[in-house]
């Protein structure tokens, strides 16, 4: 097992990608701490993991409240005795035209997605440094750190900020055996996809559009993202730090979607 007896904290662990991350880390032998703003859904996830033989502890924590993040660290050490890894997965977003963004909405996104991620990264890194055994931190960012969509300014600002401080942290913490990497997923089969489909004329039309913009011609799955996280948390990636890895089936490498007039139909002449 790749994460045997390692204690891994996973934020946003009550739904979507966080659930798959928690399940996969537990399958790989980790002692998992899952967090979210409320305990209700966390408990359901924890019950499922325990039923499969995994070790997990649900803990309430709001990423925008520094005192709750400090309490999370304290309780994790009380329950499991160490912190070996962190997946900063929690995040929120308000989709709104740039000219209509409310400063309070802007601040709320940054408080959770950027400031909360920074605080928890720092708290975990301090504990890893004190313990002297190193560790691995994985920040869940987005393809939005490479390119944008209309209405995503607060989210984009936060995720690009996460990439920035994580690279700086990776440089400083490498000497202590602490690795910091960023995983930027593309379009994934989660609740967000359901929201996208709900706003489209039809599911088929929506899927056809996105397939045309993804070289792999499908959505990525939560399990695929979770397996990437396990790799980055494990010793298999011991030489990787400061990287922003795009798990997007080639989405960010595509210049323009497939069209009848795309480059494959153009015969270049010699200059």
Model-assigned labels for residue ranges:
Residues 12-16:
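Conserved glycine-rich cofactor-binding loop
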Residues 97-98, 102-110, 210:
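Substrate-binding pocket helix/loop in short-chain dehydrogenase/reductase
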Residues 121, 158, 166:
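Active-site helix of classical SDR
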Residues 126, 171-175, 238:
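Alpha-helical segment proximal to the catalytic Tyr-Lys
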Residues 142:
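Residue(s) in the substrate-gating loop at a strand-loop-helix junction
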Residues 218-247:
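C-terminal substrate-recognition "lid" of short-chain dehydrogenase/reductases
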Residues 230, 241-271:
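Short C-terminal tail/terminal secondary-structure segment
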């Amino acid at each position: 097992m790749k994460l045997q007896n390692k204690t891994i904290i996973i934020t946003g662990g009550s739904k979507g990608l966080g659930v798959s991350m928690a399940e996969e880390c537990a399958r790989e032998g980790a002692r998992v701490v899952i967090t979210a703003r409320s305990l209700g859904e966390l408990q359901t996830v924890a019950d499922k993991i325990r039923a499969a033989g995994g070790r997990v502890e649900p803990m309430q924590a709001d990423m925008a409240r520094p005192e709750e993040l400090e309490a999370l660290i304290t309780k994790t050490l009380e329950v499991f005795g160490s912190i070996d890894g962190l997946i900063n997965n929690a995040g929120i977003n308000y989709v709104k035209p740039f000219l209509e963004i409310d400063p309070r909405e802007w601040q709320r996104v940054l408080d959770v997605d950027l400031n909360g991620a920074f605080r928890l990264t720092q708290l975990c890194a301090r504990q890893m440094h004190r313990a002297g055994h190193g560790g691995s931190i994985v920040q869940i960012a987005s393809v939005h750190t490479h390119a944008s969509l209309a209405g995503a300014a607060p989210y984009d600002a936060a995720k690009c900020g996460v990439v920035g401080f994580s690279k700086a942290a990776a440089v400083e913490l490498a000497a202590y055996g602490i690795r910091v990497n960023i995983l930027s997923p593309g379009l994934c089969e989660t609740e967000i996809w359901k929201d996208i489909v709900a706003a489209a004329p039809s599911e088929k039309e929506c899927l056809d559009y996105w397939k045309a913009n993804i070289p792999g011609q499908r959505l990525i799955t939560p399990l695929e993202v979770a397996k990437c996280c396990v790799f980055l948390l494990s010793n298999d990636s011991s030489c990787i730090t400061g990287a922003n890895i795009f798990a997007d089936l080639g989405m960010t490498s595509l210049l323009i979607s497939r069209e009848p007039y795309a480059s494959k139909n153009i015969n270049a002449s010699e200059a």
